[in-house]
């Protein structure tokens, strides 16, 4: 294993329901990226944007060479093929690690998955297949964080093989998205140093979600 090397993978929803939140998503992602560029240690960044199709805009790029996300990259529209996006990306990274020299395999691997709606367009992967893939990689020490809006994220995460302790419901608006990326940055910083995520790593998101949900009631 290569010490101080982190495999950091983002799978980000850009379906039609994200319309109006492009600027916040781009800004939140770029702000998080800039913070991580200043931290010690090597990081390989993969970024997959998905609707009914997936597009990989960064494929294991060294973090200091990753360009900022732009409006040309993050164009919303279409449906939500979450299972295909996750399945394809996990398979891709899995195969790279499988055939790499042992000394080149990253010490840490973290997937950050964000969606704002229910799966409704996948044709290549089933939920059972994705769950099996994720559970296999968790046994190898991979971490998966799942952020969901307008769904029961805990239930969806469970169906994907992601424990509720690694799942957060969030408010899909400017404040919620920016809070997501701020918390993700803290989590990435923690894992990059080899520390375990604290039990309350998502406390800020949970509090924002519950407080504003209660106000609506």
Residue ranges and their predicted role:
Residues 1-217:
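Acidic, low-complexity intrinsically disordered regions
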């Amino acid at each position: 294993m290569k010490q101080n090397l982190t495999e950091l993978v983002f799978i980000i929803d850009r379906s039609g329901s994200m319309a109006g939140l492009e600027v916040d998503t781009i800004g939140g992602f770029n702000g998080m990226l800039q913070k991580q560029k200043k931290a010690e240690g090597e990081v390989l960044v993969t970024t997959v944007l998905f609707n009914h199709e997936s597009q990989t805009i960064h494929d294991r790029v060294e973090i200091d060479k990753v360009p900022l996300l732009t409006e040309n990259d993050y164009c919303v529209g279409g449906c939500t093929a979450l299972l295909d996006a996750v399945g394809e990306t996990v398979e891709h990274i899995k195969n790279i690690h499988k055939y790499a020299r042992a000394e080149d395999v990253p010490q840490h691997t973290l997937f950050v998955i964000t969606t704002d709606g229910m799966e409704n367009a996948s044709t290549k992967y089933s939920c059972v297949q994705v769950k099996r893939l994720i559970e296999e990689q968790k046994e190898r020490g991979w971490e998966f964080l799942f952020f969901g809006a307008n769904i029961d994220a805990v239930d969806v995460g469970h169906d994907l093989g992601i424990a509720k302790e690694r799942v957060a419901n969030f408010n899909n608006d400017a404040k919620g998205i920016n809070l997501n990326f701020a918390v993700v940055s803290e989590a990435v910083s923690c894992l990059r140093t080899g520390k375990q995520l604290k039990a309350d790593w998502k406390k800020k998101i949970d509090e924002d979600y519950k407080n504003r949900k209660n106000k609506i009631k």
